[in-house]
Amino acid sequence: MRRLHPEPVPQLYEPTLESVRRHPLPDWYQNAKLGIFVHWGLYSVPGWAASRKDPYSIIAERGFDAYFRENPYAEWYLNSLKFDDGPTRAYHDRNFGKHFAYEDFQPMFESAAQKWVPDDWAQLFQKTGAGYAVLTAKHTDGYLLWPSQVANLARPGYRSSRDLVGEFVAAARARGLRAGLYYSGGMDWLLNPQRIDTPEKIYSTILDGPKYVEYADAHWRELIDRYRPSVMWGDIMYPAGANTLELFSYYYNRVPDGVINDRFATRFTPPQRPGLQPPAIHYDFLTPEYTSFDEIQAQKWETCRGIGSSFGYNRDDDEDSYLSAGAVIRMLIDIVSKNGNLLLNVGPRADGSIHELQRKCLLGLGAWLDVNGEAIRGTRPWSHAASTTLAGVPVRFTRKENTLYAMLLDTPGEAEIRIRNLHAAGGSEVRLLGIDERLKWRQSGSDLIVRLPAPLPDSPAHALRISVGT
């Protein structure tokens, strides 16, 4: 295997647990709060999944057998094809023919992707108010979105000749976004084609052995050397036998302000809670998937999820299966109040175009952040995340220096609201973001009473800025 040989770099970190744990969480990641995830690959050509329900609903209602057979994740199309009596196989045979192999999507994808204009994405993500974006450089199907010098062990030409990764990174940075890369380290269905139909098989099919360890490591080092990603977003563990501390120190020495997620475990241990993967020995942030936390977490975390129930493009998604901008806004507020980020996914079509309903959601989120972004970006959790008004409107808190933000997750029905368990110091100034007007307020015991402007703006959530008196 050929490897790139970059110029020597300062060795700030050694391949030891003690050394990599000294890596600080960079301010840019803590401050950004919102990232955009992009799942794009061969699975974008069929662009289909059998279910439009979120994974936890399917599992709760019908169990894991139904979940794997009718997987809502369109990016798992190849695994879903392996159920001979399943809906994906029926869809595939009807539309492409029973002798059409998954790998035959490669020329179709590469032809369609020629229409992709990278700045279209970057401009949209910038308008959304995101601080970073993460692209799937290699998903579980093993196909590479960059012209790697490290060929697939089973199918050497299984990679894009156009440098989709490089163009994505350059376009994102040109628009002021950080660029991160996703890589499925433990799973590659071209190298291990065993069907996954139980949770146990997710982990029993993880690849290992010296050849695959060298292969995955070489890919990551190539991605680091070429693109200097701000986020190393691994998935579904990492091959047993790999020295992840060497990989992490290699990365930190080249990208000192980069971050690494929690999905690089090289041996199975039970996840800390549903929605998390087995914990790695080191990480900068946790990654609950399609779920969240109930309380403020000391450890930085990032929820990842699609606007719909899939990460990859599902052509059957519609307004009923996509989240509205309002739902995403309220989700973001809740996550940020508990020390989290939101990595919100879009699934482009094979030609790079993004569904109009996904675009509508992103632009609605961006419009809200244009007015209320100061209550989100650059903030930290307060002493507690949540309260309510006397009338039951949910409230979430963030803080920034001498300013507290109280965000109402609905529009109150009364002109005067009473926020429970919130005390403002004498001389504090209360304003509603987006309106240049000081609001009248008074303290009543442990509650803060605020008279709102009339009429209130039409908005999914309203942010009060409480500038603490000094």
Per-region residue spans from a language model:
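Mature catalytic domains of secreted/periplasmic carbohydrate-active enzymes
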Residues: 1-470
